[in-house]
Amino acid sequence: MYSRSLSALAFTADFPPAAPKFHQRTHRVRLRNLGTTDKKSSHKIKYKKIPRVHQNLKGGFYMKITFIGATHEVTGSCYYLEAAGHKFLVDCGMEQGPDYYENAEIPVALGEIEFVLLTHAHIDHSGNLPAIYAKGFRGPVYATDATSHLCDIMLRDSAHIQMFEAEWRNRKGRRQGKPEFVPAYTMEDAMGVIRNFVGCPYNKMITPAEGISARFIDAGHLLGSASIELTIREEDTEKKIVFSGDIGNTCQPLIKDPEYLHHADYIVMESTYGDRSHGEKPDYVKLLSEIIQETFDRGGNLVIPSFAVGRTQEMLYFIRQIKADGLVYGHDGFKVYVDSPLANEATTIFSEHQYDCFDEEAMELIKKGINPISFPGLKISVTSDDSKSINYDEEPKVIISASGMCDAGRIKHHLKHNLWNEKNTILFVGYQAVGTLGRALIEGAADVKLFGEPVHVAAHICQMPGISGHADVNGLLDWAKAFEEKPQKVFVTHGDDTCLLYTSPS
């Protein structure tokens, strides 16, 4: 039914190659990205023009979709819909990164939005929920149970970051006579919207409003992630629109593979890796065990900068198997420190949702009484004193800490204590964005600055290839080809221009 190219899908969706003209490129990092000009902020906010999709069919059926974010970029997913006499959002994500297209303003008073349907907990899909709460939204947020629980910790963490950055900017700004910088939202806003979450099981139809029903289908991207099948009824007409969310990579550790859907009139589909194949997956357990062995034999530490939610739990899964199979010789009982408050809370939530989210391999371990993400020698650091004490442990050890790109969090302290020593290894297990400390290290920086001080890079720097929570071009097209009848339109989003329009050589 489909050719093997995302450009074909984009064309089917009438998503024109010239679409970048709708946008204004900006190079400013901005916390506040809802509303118009912020009089209290030190700069003005520009918004991109956005395409609106209207479907006015016989029988009185009318639906409008406004693409607020994740158009010609990956972050800031947000879709505003008017249908069956209701106004609502699918996702409400925050823009991330220093070089992006800014989200447009939601074209309605936020108090008029009745509800939000949320695909998953990642901040680029959920991170602006507290911001719309601060501006008047009081409706329910429907998400899977696991997503609701992850958002509880992730939105609170995001609010802490917003407030910390605003305080830091204002300390500098006051000395320069600049006006106060206002954070995107506060902890009170985050807690307010968290209280409005409604947890939903997979595959159960819900009715958030008259004439609108929705179903969450496992997307296999993150614990609790979902594609959303939305059914809209007006008079005698019924239309089905599917939002893919972020489609997961197959054969990920711990969580299930993405489920396919088979019927839709319209599809809104992501394209994060729409221009590339991940290639053959390496044996991660073998590769990681070899890195641990080589590092420990030198008498060094293995430091793993890791995303707190998802990637940290995958690393624990691999290390449990390494320990169980005795793949590291001469270092029995080696310690593994997880030093990230957010990662620790997320790991607890993973364990609480094993029965509805874990895959067959993980469930087989659980049936045998084995926790797939816990093992002897695992040490959880909670307090700052716990974190500091790791540096006094002279035994070779594994340290897993956030943030995954090394720009914030406790990982910076561990890099300061370990980068200078040639016995140690720094292992990157996730994407490193341009401009981050992690990117500088993998590109061979000889010296870096940490806490204002220069640190020489003598440690071994390496990467574990191929780890991704996103489907590649083949996985995306397999997901699209599962639809048994050709939809009326497919809208390709959540990717840069290359990914949107690229024709895969495979």
Predicted features, each with a name:
Residues D99-L150, R156, H263, I267:
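Active-site metal-binding motif and surrounding structural segment of the metallo-beta-lactamase
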Residues I291-G300, S306-V429:
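Hard-cation-handling environments
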Residues I113-H122, L129, Y142-T144, D218, ...:
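Active-site neighborhood of phospho(di)ester-bond hydrolases with catalytic His/Asp-centered motifs
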Residues S158-L222, Q354-E394:
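Metallo-beta-lactamase
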